[in-house]
């Protein structure tokens, strides 16, 4: 992300293609952002889902498997999972790095006080991931945020986006608002904001 312009110029000089690692969440978020921008939408918020709880920030590679409901044998021996890697997924480190990459690549802002990981299901994304002055949770239009698949009681929320990515877009005029409604898109109460999400991702 930090050297993207240089890599793109280098690829052009050598008549080759430079692309992102499609498959993982940051690149899939960028794909959605670019689609929205090419179609004339402003991107209000973009990000991904994950399983997050504030208590997980104290997790270590030695305690990580209990949070996943797995035994060490099942995770490490049978599936070959790396406890350090999977702890970074849980404690928020990887989410922070990935949202930094998306922010750098897209010019979307980071939240003013860091990621908040609100528990939000897919049918509430367009209602909640909009600016606070519009009744939502985010600081301003045009930022990144990660949503949690569990609530503060560590219970699964309905229709979570644990493995996926999303964007929130804004209608620029009444015609587009009408289209949101006419085509059955999920919106906020004003009909101005809608969300697009992808439920899964693969490592890239």
Show which residues each predicted segment covers:
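C-terminal catalytic/substrate-binding lobe primarily of soluble NAD(P)-dependent oxidoreductases
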Residues: 67-68, 72-204
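Generic structural signal for short, flexible, solvent-exposed coil/loop and linker residues
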Residues: 7, 18, 32, 156-158, ...
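Short gly/pro/ser/thr-enriched loop/turn and capping motifs at secondary-structure boundaries
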Residues: 2-8, 25-29, 50-54, 120
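Short alpha-helix boundary/capping motifs
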Residues: 14, 39, 64, 127-132
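General beta-strand structural signal in soluble alpha/beta enzymes
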Residues: 1-2, 18-22, 43-47, 112-114
